[in-house]
Structure formats: C-alpha cells, structure tokens
Amino acid sequence: MADLNVEIVAVERELWSGPATFVFTRTTAGEIGILPRHIPLVAQLVDDAMVRVEREGEDDLRIAVDGGFLSVTEETVRILVENAQFESEIDADAAKEDAASDDERTAAWGRARLRALGQID
C-alpha cells in the first residue's frame, strides 16, 4: 500500500513527521480516517482530539492534541495544533485531574490525553 506523508506540528515543536498507512482523528464535522489518495480537505479538530497514526510494521502512534487543524492532500496529512503529547509523555493522574476540571479548555486537554492513553473513547 502507498504511504501518506504525515506531519504533526505543535506551536513549540515539530512532534512527528514520517510515512504512515492510515491516520484517524476527530474533527468538528465528525470522525475521519485518512488513507493514501484521500480527497483534499481542510478541517478543524475538536478540542479534545486524539490522533492515531498507523505505520507499516511499527506500533501505532497515539497523540493527544489540543485543538488545531488538519490539512489533507492526496499524499500528505498536516496537523497543526496548539499543544500535543505522545502517549508515552502523558501523566495519567494529571490527565484525570484536568479532565475533571470546571474549566472547559483544561477539561478538554485532560480528555484528549486520556483518549491517547486509551482510557476513554
């Protein structure tokens, strides 16, 4: 299968760039799965999104993202976000505490991290 070129960039760092076979996330229009040769589009991510990047012969990447935008061409997926963390960087206890916050923005970031950990859908 042909690969997608995927770039995930947060404000303070380029998080990840490389080939992938599939990308899944949630936009304000709903869930989306992207395969190579997908129709071009631009979409806004939900505030509590998780991006899953499937790679041939490697473990999936699970990344919590804090809002942002998704740009898709036939061969490239670019995800531009305010903040992002790999699953391995997430403190589960802090994410749970944030998810219970009265502040909606903090709660959304907590939920995104819990999604990346696979603790909520």
UniProtKB/Swiss-Prot annotation:
Q: How does it sit in the membrane?
A: Peripheral membrane protein
A GO cellular component annotated for this chain's UniProt record is:
plasma membrane
Whether Ion transport counts among this entry's keywords is yes
- An example of a Pfam family matching this protein is ATP-synt_DE_N
Q: Which InterPro entries match?
A: ATP_synth_F1_dsu/esu, ATP_synth_F1_dsu/esu_N, ATPsynth_dsu/esu_N
Q: Which Gene3D superfamilies match?
A: F0F1 ATP synthase delta/epsilon subunit, N-terminal
Cross-referenced CDD domains: F1-ATPase_delta (cd12152)
Q: Name one GO molecular function term.
A: proton-transporting ATP synthase activity, rotational mechanism
Q: Where in the cell is it found?
A: Cell membrane
| Coiled-coil stretches noted in the UniProt entry, renumbered to this chain | none
Instruction: Extract the SUPFAM superfamilies matched here.
Output: Epsilon subunit of F1F0-ATP synthase N-terminal domain
Q: What protein is this chain from?
A: ATP synthase epsilon chain
